[in-house]
């Protein structure tokens, strides 16, 4: 089972973005879901299944990533490759992904229907998708937090639980490119 994570950002402006695999950073390109799958077929699936995302200023948007969600995996890929809001918005507009470490692999590549990004502040819902980490982009860079325990032993949501975000560049320093 993968180390699952949430990738999130709060938009600083209103913008409409449709995921464009050709606008991904050179160091973190698009890839098909299956290694033996034709790249052109995967691109057709993405084009057919992806929808425009309407980001609103001040709103938080998040996607799920199944593999390598720990700081040394997804965190390093984010810090090294997704350095400005436009690049982050394009990634979020890809929708939920199997992986983003090394290659961005949205679930739409295998023909799945596009699911709009979560458009709510980070909170207990993150635990409900079985994610272990949250990666959050800010104008100051990427931050990461383990998902805290939002529920007591009886399954009742605790009040006042917060994420303990740390700069990803510090948490994963030994794994980052210079």
Residue ranges and their predicted role:
Residues 7-24:
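Short regulatory "switch" loops immediately downstream of catalytic or recognition motifs
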Residues 10-15, 54-58, 137-141:
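Short acidic-glycine loop/turn motifs at beta-strand connectors
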Residues 58-86:
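Extracellular beta-rich globular recognition domains, centered on the fibrinogen C-terminal
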Residues 80-178:
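Low-complexity intrinsically disordered segments
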